[in-house]
Amino acid sequence: MTFNDGVRGDAGRVRTSRGRRGMAIGGGLGGGGLIVVVLVMLLTGQDPAGLLGGGGGGDAGPGQDLSHCRTGADANAHTECRMVLTADALDVYWDGVMSEQTTGAYTPPGFTIFTDSVQTGCGAATSAVGPFYCPADSSVFLDLGFFDQLESQLGAQNAPLAQMYIVAHEWGHHTQHMLGTMESVDRQDTGPSGDAVRLELQADCYAGMFIGAAATTIDPDTGQAFLREPTADQVRTALDAAAAVGDDRIHESAGREVEPHTWTHGSAEQR
């Protein structure tokens, strides 16, 4: 999926940080993070204590400079700039949806691109956790290195729309948090029809809503649509990224028996 070259981005919308290695993450996160933790545990046998827990520490210093992320052309050329413009487009889209379909106002989530580790309201996280949403501070966290892992470890294509889908999925969790959905479900209810899976599938649906409307979501600064209409091949990359983190795919990749009663994110087909 391609941004229109002339649309404008706000580099200040996204925070960056560089942290220390060997930190851990506390409970309460939402989104892809937990599924990636499970994948690492299954494929490597790594002790989860290094990934999940209360962990201390904090950000070690400033992260990547985003001052060059100004236009859609920059977003098409650089992954970090694609994140900036995607955040801008998601904010405009969800502000419109919330104002038209709910009585509440849209509050943008925080968005941090981090390297190695990051301190959050849910605890301290390493890059191994993957992208996640932390409801405690209403923020999305992402290490750009995950996109390479998406292809090398999970078997999906590291393509622009796949990247945008991942971010839009985490924004979907923010929408659930704003609407009270995240807090009203039993996230310990696992299995194909359990609350945990339903929460993830709804976030997928919200991501699809954004992608479906992206070519008609208008940059208020230029009056142009943020994005061009996606091609069928581009849509396939997003669907493949969603399927790649299906619980059954992860079990199979680890050489384990597929156990539907343990699912928290849904099967590849569901996603």
Show where each model-derived region lies:
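Catalytic zinc-binding patch centered on the HExxH motif and its immediate surroundings
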Residues: 49-52, 117-143
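Active-site recognition of the HExxH zinc-binding catalytic motif
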Residues: 39, 94, 142, 165-178, ...
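C-terminal capping/extension segments of zinc metalloprotease domains
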Residues: 62, 97, 121-135, 221-271
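Extracytoplasmic low-complexity, Pro/Thr/Ser/Ala/Gly-rich segments
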Residues: 3-8, 48-113
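Long amphipathic alpha-helical segments used for membrane anchoring, targeting, substrate engagement
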Residues: 1-68
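Short helix/loop segments within enzyme catalytic domains
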Residues: 81-87, 91-93, 97-103, 198-250
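Post-HEXXH active-site segment of zinc metalloproteases
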Residues: 177-201
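Short pre-active-site segment immediately N-terminal to the catalytic Zn-binding motif
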Residues: 148-165, 191-197
